[in-house]
Amino acid sequence: MSHANRKEITGLTRMTPKGLKELCKKDKLYQTPRLNDVLYLHYQGFQCIENLEEYTELKCLWLECNAISEIQGLEKLGKLKCLFLQNNLITKIENLDPCRELDTLNLSSNHIRKIQNIGTNILPVLNTLTIASNYLKDSDSLSDLIQCKTLSVLDLSNNRIDDILIVKIFEQMVSLKVLVLQGNPVVSRLPQYRKTLILACKELTYLDSRPVFPRDRACAEAWKRDGYEGERKENNRWKRAERRKTRESINCTIRMRNSHRPPDQQDPLLRSSDSEDDTCTETTRKKVALENDCVDDLWEEVSCEQPISDHGTSTSSSVEDKDGTSSQDDLIAEKLSNRGTLEGRPTVLYENEVSNIKSVNQNIKNFEPRSIETKVFQDVSKISPIIIEEKRVPNINLNNEPSDVKNRKVIKCEKTGYTSTGQVLKENVFDEDAEIKNVEDMVQCQDIIKSNEDMNSEFVVSTKLEKDVEQTCIALRNEAQCKELDEDQSIKEIESKLINEMYENVAADDHDKHNETVDLNLKKTASAQHARTFFFEENKMTRRFYQEDKKSSLLAKSKEEALLEEDCIISNEKCAYDLEEIGRQMEEDLAELRQSTQKLVGFSIDEDADSKTDSEIDEEDLMAQQDPYSPLLQQQFKDRRMKIMLKEETKAQGESIRDLNITLSNESSSDDKQDQLFAKLLDDATENIPKRIFGTGCDSLSSAWPQEECLLQLTLSEVKETPDQEIVFKNSITNSSSFEEANEICVRIDQKMAEEEAALGKLLHDLENEANTKVKHDETNSSKESDAARICTSLLDDIMVELTFNEKRWHEKPKSFKFGPIESDDEFSYSFEPQLEKLVPPALEDPARGKSLRECLDTFSDFVSSMADPKLPLMLGRNPTSGVEKIRAAQELLKSKNLAELYADTAESLNSQVAKEIEKRKRRVAASATRCFNQRDKYDDTLELVQNRLMIVKKDSGDLEELPPPPPLISDTESEDYDTAEDEYTPGNGGHKHTHGSKPQDSKEHLMNNLLKQKQDKPDTVEEVGKKNDHDEDEFYSLEAMTTFGNLDAEFFHKLDLQKVNDSEDSESAINCMRSYNELQAYMKSGSLKHQLNSEDTKMLQTMFSTVASDGKPKLRNPKGEEEDDLLKKMVLRMKEYEEREHQLQLVPHEIPRELSPIKLSLGGSKLFEQKNKIPETGLVHAENELTGNIQFIDNKKTNNDKSTDAIEKNCEPLVKTSCQTSNKSIDDDIQSDVSTDYESGEEVLVVEPPKLSDAVLKSLYSDGFEADLKMVHELEEATRRNLYRYHSNVMHNSTNNHSFSTKKTLPTKTSTSEQSVGAKAKWAKIAERLHEFLDPETILRKEQIGERDACEDSEDEDFAFEENNFEKDEKLIISEEYNSTQNICDGNSGPSKLDGSDQFASIKGFENITEMPTYNMELNSQSKKKTSEKLSNEIENIITTCSSFEAPTDSIGIEYFEDPTLTQINPEGLKTEQIECNLQILNEDGDVVVQELSVNAQVSFE
């Protein structure tokens, strides 16, 4: 079924540009296609996508609900982002490569069976793919989705997918967020469909018809981990977390309301009803744990289960602590619901194994304590308890191994918030002392439970506790430094190293604490007693809180429940008290440990050793005996301590010991500030603790985590020194704001700045020295290089001069011919050069030949690179002249005078010019805008296309109105003297108006001077002519002539296929004319050259020609009045003769022109001649020279006694000029000819018969400027009417014999043949005069549109240029043979009279100035003109045949029939003259019978 039939049957439509524009108009889009970014083509019945090439800016294209079967036609839509192709007939996804920015693709309801060609390599930003309701079936059809790395929305609903392996495909789609699979069989086949897909797609947020919430994902992960039970628990946790969140928001509102009410009117807080059972279970478990003296679970509750509360009041916090309504599940679920701060594990930093406790205890026992007397305990009464919250709790680990009962101690330390490095200490202080805290905190936890009973024993052993704390600090520090010495690269070691450096930096400020007197220790007992009373008060207070909460219980309890709740209340009260005590003890312990560690830095080992008394040494020995550690461990620890002491000796030297006696009042007054600051530090230190995301193993302790997860979750923060904060903390904590302290700080800063300044000065000095040495080195190198460069330049110049000279000499030699091996046997041939591979590449054999220095350097660099990397392509074959030309052009440019003007322009002047141009452009834009605004009312009407014209349709009346004319063009110059081409041309008289003003008639002297100048500058003249020709070729402005004559050109060139020419009797006259091709060209050129000189210039030129011809040198004559009078008289006579002849020709009735028909060309052909010669131009040059010479001989002979020579020679002068002009134009073998006219030399050259046109057609082709041509044509028409139709074929057979050199032909035969040939020539001449213009649209346009150029000067230039060329070519040519043969022709034609010696001499000399010599008179009557034309035609043909006989026995050269419009310039220095001898055969018309044989001797000049 054909395409057209299918279209008719289906009724489908095509996308056409017109239809698309109509749709744009309907949708109120732009009519210019590229301005639209959307296009609505849905519901149109289109069967294919086409004609969208112009819509290059489209971003959205709607094509749904059509009949499109193939994706195509999108090649130009590179910016398309959305393509909607649903409800079509598409079977394959293809041809989307050009749409690289496609984001959304909808292919629903098509016939697609496989997803393909949409990978990231083709559609790199594809985000949404909708491919529902297709024929997708299995995982193979979806396998290409893995390549879609950016696809996040995928709709596969209502397909036929039943393969469960698609889950693996979705698992590999990293960006998939939305997936729609409903309507596929696989939904029912997948077990646990929704959970499976949620687990497979990590980023999935929407599945089928509802979102994927975080709760869904958590339940799915729990189901994967623990089955349905885990899923149920996880679901309950989320539900409780949601209820808890709601309850907390309500309780917060109740608290805000209660804060403004009296206590008796306050509302109770809400409690959880569904978690009562969990609460009872928890309280029972706690009670049992307390009775069994096990606090592991209690500590877990402390570290993990504290309710989150912001910095609220202590009342609300304690109420929340006493609620007891929350469980571990509640808290975890709540944390999970707040995804911003997920905390699935205890917020602890480091947990250590049990062995750490033992090793620390051993280290403590084995180490000798120092400086026990300096231990200071502060008054505890100043310390306010800090409420422990889960976010703020210091992260201290507790290992589940109870310590030995003997080592249980309660440590009460001096609480100080002192720090000197701000943020560094905040982040590190809790992490660094983890081991110490583990030991001490376990001790605290176990002892605080029985704190009421053991309070007295605490104060008894306080001295021992003080020593234990000191030993613990020393042990930690020494152990960390031992690890540093052993270079154990673990996290603990790195942190210890950092904290040691920090302590050393701030050691200088810590000396105020180490020397306090022993009397401060007297405060210990009072402080402890005060603390005990404080604890008991706090205990009572907490009991009251619990009792109040209990009263607010709304439910009635049974007796057992009441008893159980009383036990729970007791346990809760203890727990609350213990929590507060632990928090306070922790802060005191931390402060004491930090202060003790800092004090150690400031001590020197020698002073400590001197300060020890015998009692202290005995006490240390006693302690060492009491410690239960083995002697081996004690010895090892002593060795390590010796290493550390040696290291600290070097560090401690040079540090001065400062003793500041600060009173107890000052200490107590600064305690409040220190407490507040340390509380802030403690809060800030716990802010950056990394939280672990809830996941697998959330309930396990962090000691059981794998090492990789520890590193991921607990990253180390960078330690950065902050000097500004350091100074602030020093001043604020230590209150060292005295004048001396400030002076010391200033001195230290000054010293530091001085050191930095000295270092900078030294660096600057080094840089200056380096720069100076580099400058000196560069100077020495440059001086050396300049010498080398000068030597190389001179050498290269010499080489280049020699090579250039050799190259010139080589060019002057004649071409040599290479012969092959002469011997028969190549193997033993000595003359045959063996084919060996050259070692040096040809491009490097003569690298400097004809090259500049730059090219030589480039060649050398290419050679070096080729040697370094042989795989690189060889770049040595560069054009050797391009660089030279560039250098010469640059030199000429530097010498030009315009550069000075160019450099004279400054930036200001150029900016001012640019500003003027911008201002001018703004004015034009403003004017255009004003014009448009003034006509705004008109443009409310609509534009419609009426009869292929754009018309204005009035909105109110509906009338049609023409468009207003466009505004006149504004010229760039905006000047009134702007000349255009139209100003120069004045139609009507065919003349030209000179653009430089009207020239007066020039005198003879002026004309002669101009001619002499032109002769001297002959090369320039030829170049100018070439330039003028180029200029003429550039002046082509329209293609109308091509459309008018295109068909005729095609027909003409088709008929130029001369193989198809048939010889016929009707074409014999045209064939005869074609033999005198040069005469034909003369006719063609005569019209265009005849009237381009005015009469006065023509007269003067002809007089000068005669003078130059006779004397050989132009003589400057003084103007004489008589000669001028004679010239004027002759001019008047000639004008009268022209008028009479014109009148006679007008009386002759002309044929009535018939209706013009299409121009057709007939075919005809003959063999003109063959030229067997390798010299391309000289043979023809001789032919032209002989031709003009013969014309001169004939005219001289016929008009010896004629006294009106000067007047009549003007008639013949254009003929001679034209023949000379065309001598170089007719044949140029160097220029490649047209394809249709490129003949082989052995083929027969066929001739085109001229077209038979009516006189009306010919006359219509003439322009008004050719009156003189018309006169000659009318005269020739008479001969045509008399002779053309009486022409018989038998005469044509005899015509070829008339062209030979035979002197036996009689005059009457020749005359009759000549008359008939003249008729054909006349007919052909009429056509040929205008044929080249008729076929050349450039000529037509040049003459009709632009106006003819002033061809007078051009013709003079051409004449003299060709005279010089011909003169130089024929300087040494001997014409004896040609002269004799020509003389025979003249004798046979006009009688027995001979040329005398002077005429011979003149004729020989005539070859030197061939075109300067005037031709002599032709009779004015038509009869004499006919005879002359007959003789001329015969002689021309004979001479051409003679010239073609200058041959060498080589391939023949065919003469082409199309003239070359450009001039061929021959260099006279390249000519060579040789004597040649050849045999000449004159053939008949068919070219197969030899009519006559001649032998010719001549001297020939050739290149």
Swiss-Prot record:
Any one GO MF annotation of this record: dynein complex binding
Coiled-coil blocks: none
Compositionally biased tracts (Basic and acidic residues): 1014-1031
Positions of LRR repeats: 34-56, 57-78, 79-100, 101-122, 125-146, 150-171
Name the UniProt record assigns to this protein: Dynein axonemal assembly factor 1 homolog
UniProt feature, compositional bias: Acidic residues: 973-985
Localization per Swiss-Prot or TrEMBL: Cell projection, Cilium
Function in brief: Cilium-specific protein required for cilia structures.
Biased segments, Low complexity type: 1303-1314
